[in-house]
Amino acid sequence: GEFSERLAESAETRGAHVMKIEGPLGGVPDLNNIREVIEEEKPKAILAVHNETSTGVANRLLNEVADLAHKNNAMILIDSVSGMPAEPIDASRFDVVATASHKALMAPPGAAIVFFNDAKMGSAPRPPAIDVAKFVKSMGKLETPYTPPIPIMYALNVSLDIILDMGLEKYVGIHMEKMNYLYNELIGIGFREVPQPFFRSNTVAALYSPIEPQIIIKKLRETGYTISGGMWKIRDKSIRIGVMGDVALSDLKIVADALRKIIQQNK
């Protein structure tokens, strides 16, 4: 997907020799293929996107990939920007997991949140800025080495209270309920899901559209709701709808009804 490509590009710009292991559109790479590449190439690190928003795919085989990585003395680094905490992931199984404030954590954009295994922290050259080691050193003094996004941190604190008061399991369940409703309704009016059912994300739906996607986006915006067009290889033939965070099921029912009318009027 788009963000897996960006992750590879990011590694390459930092001097890494990147080998891509590709899977089918709407799915994830085969575990046996991953195992063969790891055992043959002996990489220093494995990078993966947990929740690929361009295709609506959640990689639910990452625990097995982590086991393969650690068995072969490789680090495993995960991009979960649009996944945590609505798409479950056990961060303790990985060396680095990065997310952000503005997706399923329901806060405004502006803060990066990173889990890391401190045992591996010193194994890579340190960059001139955003040095994790400096953050760790400052934590003991309840300080940060650089000016933090204070308003975002306050907003994040509020959103975390909401999630924790609700309970993480219930929060995940609500997202699954919203996503199941959305797919069931839209498939019934002619849309086709992009992700394979087992890998269907809890936070973003990606669907092939029965009519021109831009018509749908424009007409839906007139009702007061905004959705996104496709990305990557399916940019011109799909739509994406985010359900993460504070998106109510009642909103999705309105969107589904509006989409039904748009499809009927534009066949």
Language-model features and meaning:
Residues 1-44:
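PLP-dependent aminotransferase-like
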Residues 29-81, 85:
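Active-site phosphate-binding strand-loop segment of PLP-dependent enzymes
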Residues 91-102:
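Conserved active-site segment immediately N-terminal to the catalytic lysine
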Residues 102-188:
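Active-site C-terminal subdomain of aminotransferase-like
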Residues 192-220:
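Conserved PLP-binding catalytic core of the aspartate aminotransferase-like
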Residues 223-240:
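Conserved PLP cofactor-binding pocket of PLP-dependent enzymes
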Residues 237-267:
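PLP-dependent enzyme catalytic core of the Aspartate aminotransferase-like
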